[in-house]
């Protein structure tokens, strides 16, 4: 049985609980179809829009005397539970329809990062809602947040995105998998924690979910990491007249494309970097990057970008 880790993009999950629940129902059908085909599946997901909205809402309430402000690690934990619950419910319902007897568990996951990671001095991870340039400038002036333009879609707040070095609950994830459980873990890249004198402490950051998914997939010795995003392929010369979709490519070819500056820092670059990190740790594995809608065809080799050693 092939083991795969599927990383869902947070932006593909919608902007509200109602929209997300409807989208997740379709996602569940696609994921359960993998189980029907005989794959052993582990699920991770992004949380960029969701954790940003949670943080924004709670801080707005605090500023208006309606409750305390919440630190980012707690907001990350809330987003893991919120997204995980909706995935869990939809997956269980779809499994029930198909008479598949399988438990689904969302595991709130901490991921260790280095306290001296240079990312803390250079925020790059987009979170939350999209703003106009004027809105972003006003919020920067009022709150001191850093904003960047995100792939032509508007401006988003950015926070530090340190490298994941250790998944704290890895043993628990492996135990659940061995017992046949469908596991949702490392949501949003995991809650970032640093280790101080043997104790863990949460820090204000968002770990890139694809890089944590790559680390998880490598530890689990997965046959494949699937990164689901908004596009059907990885492209070079994206948005230009000579735009080109990448089909099956090697690690060396992707490294050359990175050197040529082909991938945007806030969107496709971390996905490609995560793919290469997984293959570096697990040379026999491969990475498939495509959209959720095209997943079935991508697994049949008809579409999507497949990266191999």
Swiss-Prot record:
GO molecular function, one term: ATP binding
Pathway annotation from the record: Metabolic intermediate metabolism; carbamoyl phosphate degradation; CO(2) and NH(3) from carbamoyl phosphate: step 1/1
Keywords annotated in UniProt: Arginine metabolism, ATP-binding, Cytoplasm, Kinase, Nucleotide-binding, Transferase
Subcellular location: Cytoplasm
Gene Ontology annotations for the cellular component aspect, listed alphabetically: cytosol
One Pfam family from the record: AA_kinase
One GO BP: arginine deiminase pathway
Alphabetized InterPro entries for the sequence: AceGlu_kinase-like_sf, Asp/Glu/Uridylate_kinase, Carb_kinase
Principal location: cytoplasm
Recorded superkingdom: Bacteria
Keyword Cytoplasm recorded: yes
Catalytic activity: hydrogencarbonate + NH4(+) + ATP = carbamoyl phosphate + ADP + H2O + H(+)
Enzyme's top EC category: transferase
EC number: 2.7.2.2
Record-stated family: Belongs to the carbamate kinase family.
Protein name: Carbamate kinase
Organism (species): Staphylococcus haemolyticus (strain JCSC1435)
């Amino acid at each position: 049985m092939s083991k795969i880790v599927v990383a869902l993009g947070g932006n593909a999950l919608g902007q509200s609980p109602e929209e997300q629940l409807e989208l997740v129902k379709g996602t569940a059908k696609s994921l359960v179809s993998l189980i029907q085909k005989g794959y052993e599946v582990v699920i991770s997901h992004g949380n960029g829009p969701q954790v940003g909205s949670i943080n924004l809402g709670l801080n707005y309430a605090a500023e208006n005397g309606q409750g305390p402000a919440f630190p980012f690690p707690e907001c990350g934990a809330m987003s893991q539970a919120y997204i995980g619950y909706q995935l869990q419910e939809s997956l269980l319902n779809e499994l029930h329809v198909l008479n598949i007897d399988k438990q689904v568990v969302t595991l709130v996951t901490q991921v260790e990062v280095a306290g001296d990671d240079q990312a803390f001095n250079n925020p790059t991870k987009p979170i939350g809602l999209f703003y106009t340039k004027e809105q972003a400038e006003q919020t920067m002036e009022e709150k001191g947040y850093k904003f960047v333009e995100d792939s032509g879609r508007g401006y988003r707040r950015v926070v530090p995105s340190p490298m994941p070095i250790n998944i704290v609950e890895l043993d628990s994830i492996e135990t659940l998998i061995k017992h046949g459980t469908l596991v949702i873990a490392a949501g949003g890249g995991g809650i970032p924690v640093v280790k101080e004198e043997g104790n863990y402490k949460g820090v204000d950051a968002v770990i890139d979910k694809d890089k944590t998914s790559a680390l998880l997939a490598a530890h689990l010795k997965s046959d494949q990491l699937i990164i689901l995003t908004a596009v059907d392929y990885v492209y070079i010369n994206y948005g230009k007249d000579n735009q080109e979709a990448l089909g099956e490519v090697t690690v060396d070819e992707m490294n050359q494309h990175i050197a040529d500056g082909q991938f945007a820092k806030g969107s496709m670059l971390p996905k490609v970097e995560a793919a290469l990190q997984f293959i570096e740790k697990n040379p026999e594995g491969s990475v498939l990057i495509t959209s959720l809608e095209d997943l079935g065809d991508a697994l049949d080799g008809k579409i999507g970008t497949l990266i191999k050693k």
